From Swiss-Prot:
NCBIfam families: fabZ (TIGR01750), PRK00006.1 (NF000582). It catalyses: a (3R)-hydroxyacyl-[ACP] = a (2E)-enoyl-[ACP] + H2O. Belongs to the thioester dehydratase family. FabZ subfamily. Involved in unsaturated fatty acids biosynthesis. Catalyzes the dehydration of short chain beta-hydroxyacyl-ACPs and long chain saturated and unsaturated beta-hydroxyacyl-ACPs. InterPro entries: FabA_FabZ, FabZ, HotDog_dom_sf. Transmembrane segments: none annotated. One of its GO terms (molecular function) is (3R)-hydroxyacyl-[acyl-carrier-protein] dehydratase activity. One of its GO terms (biological process) is lipid A biosynthetic process. This is 3-hydroxyacyl-[acyl-carrier-protein] dehydratase FabZ. The active site is at residue 48.
Length: 141
């Protein structure tokens, strides 16, 4: 298990854009699981939407990408590198994520060759799928 401080040693994201609180499982270069506790104090709720706070779907995708980045960047040969979005495919949002939810994030790396890879991400709340996506990434310096 990795806490926030340990996650920050692997990926460069910081408040308010670090969207993973814990990594609960990781297999280097293969998969990772983690979660984000979604609180009413999140900056994005100030404008999305003040009377009906909903976590923006693109931030759910970003949270999944950060979990996938941990799976890739925890590998010794990738330490100090960055993981960049190269594509998003087959993205579906199935339910809203609201303050008080614990967003569970799981990414499986389905292909990685050189500096390009692809992962399948699933986000759930209370066991129900809220988002599914295929992520393409590029590793850079």
């Amino acid at each position: 298990m990795l806490d926030t401080q340990q996650i920050k040693e692997i990926i460069p994201h910081r408040y308010p854009f670090l969207l993973v609180d814990r990594i609960t499982e990781v297999e280097e270069g293969k998969r990772a699981k983690g979660y984000k506790n979604v609180t009413a104090n999140e900056e994005f709720f100030n404008g999305h939407f003040p009377q009906y706070p909903v976590m923006p779907g693109v931030l759910i995708v970003e949270a999944l990408a950060q979990v996938g980045a941990v799976a890739m960047l925890i590998k010794e040969e990738n330490r100090g590198r960055l993981a960049f979005f190269a594509g998003i495919d087959n993205c579906r949002f199935k339910k809203q994520v609201k303050p008080g939810d614990q967003l569970h994030l799981e990414v499986e790396i389905i292909r990685a060759r050189g500096t390009i890879g692809r992962g399948k991400g699933v986000a759930t709340v209370d066991g129900e799928v809220v988002c599914e996506v295929e992520l393409t990434f590029a590793l850079g310096e």
